C-alpha cells in the first residue's frame, strides 16, 4: 500500500453484523491488515481485515461495533499487519490479550517491533530438542519428561484443576545446573474474571512474576483478541529466546476457547463449517501456533510450549485434542477418576506420553537409572490397574501373593508418586528416589527391566 493510500479515509461502510463491518470501494487492502476506525462520537477503535476481495473488505472490530453506523463511521487502513513492540522490560509485567498493560504500569518502550504472525522457520535450521526442563512435578519430570524446544499439550476436562497445574508449572519450571536465563510466557485465553484474579494473585504471591510475562484475555473480551493473544505471547517468547538468548517456556490456556473464537469468526464470515462446526483450516491454524516452538541453529535460546486444552465432554477424539495430537509431540492427560479420589495433580500416566522424553533423560541430563526405573514402575502400575478390574469380579482374596503386590503398587504409586502438594517442587532425584521406594513392594526378581548394577546402586534395600 502506498503512503497516499494509507491516508485515505473511507466512509463507505455498507453493513454491520455482530463484530464485523463491511467496507466497499477500497483499494490495495491486504488480509490481516490493521484498521483504524473512527466512531461517530470521535472515539478511536482498532480492527483487522479478515477478508479482502476486489474492492470489498470485511473488518473485525476489536472493541465491538456498538455505537457504529454505516453513514458516519470512518475507516483507515494503516498498511501493515499487527506488530508488537517488544523489550526485556516486559518481564515482570501483566498485559491484556492485545498486549496493553493491565498492571497499572507504564507502556513498554519498544526495543523492536515484530509481526505477531512470526516468520517461517526453515526446517533445516531446526535442531532436535534434547535438554531436560524440570517442572518439579513427578508425573511430568519422571514419566513424561519435558525437553527444551518441545511442544507437549495438557488434555484436561471441565472442572479439573488444570489452572492450578498451569500456575504450578509456571512458577517451578527451570533449567537445571545452568547459568542460562529462563523465562515463562503465560497466555490465558477466554478465562473468567475469577480465573484471571487467581493467576495474577498467584504470580505475585509466589514471586514467579519476576521472570514471567503474562497475557490475559477475558471471556468477555472480543473474539478477535483471543486469536491475537497466543500470537502476541509467542512473538514475545521468540524475541526473548532468539534475540536475548533466553530459554522460554510458553504456557497457553485454554486452547479450546481459542478454537471457539475461530468458530465464532468463521460463522460470522459465513464460511462452510468443517467437523462439529469448526473451520476446515483449524488444523493449519493450530499448526501456526504449535510449530513456533523449537530450537534454531546458531541461536542459544529455545522456545518450549505447554498448551492446555479442555476436552468437551472429556472426549479425546474431539477435533481440538485430535488435531492438537497430530501436531504436538505427545500429551499429558488429566483424569477425572484420579481427581475424584482427591489426587493432585490428577495426571493419568498410562495414556500420557512425551515422544521426546528419551532425548532429555539419562546420565548427564537427569540420572543414569531414569529410563529403566520409570519403565519398571510404569509396567507395574499398568498391571496393577488391570488387576483392579479383576478384583471387582473375583474379589481380592482370590488373588495370588504376586498379584496383591502389584495391586498394592498401583495404590501406592498414585498416593506417593502422582500425588504431591500444590507448592511441592520435587527435584528429579527426589522423583526417582520415590519410584525406587515404591518398587520395594515387589520382590527384586520382579524387577526385570532394571539391571542388577542399578538395583545395587539405587534400591533402598542395598543402601547402607
From Swiss-Prot:
It comes from the Archaea. It is a peripheral membrane protein. CDD domains: ATP-synt_V_A-type_beta_C, ATP-synt_V_A-type_beta_N, V_A-ATPase_B. Its main location: membrane. It is found in: Cell membrane. One of its GO terms (biological process) is proton motive force-driven plasma membrane ATP synthesis. InterPro entries: ATP-synt_VA_C (IPR055190), ATPase_a/bsu_AS (IPR020003), ATPase_F1/V1/A1_a/bsu_N (IPR004100), ATPase_F1/V1/A1_a/bsu_nucl-bd (IPR000194), P-loop_NTPase (IPR027417), V-ATPase_su_B/beta (IPR022879). Belongs to the ATPase alpha/beta chains family. Component of the A-type ATP synthase that produces ATP from ADP in the presence of a proton gradient across the membrane. The B chain is a regulatory subunit. This is A-type ATP synthase subunit B. It comes from Methanococcus aeolicus (strain ATCC BAA-1280 / DSM 17508 / OCM 812 / Nankai-3). The lineage of its organism: Archaea, Methanobacteriati, Methanobacteriota, Methanomada group, Methanococci.
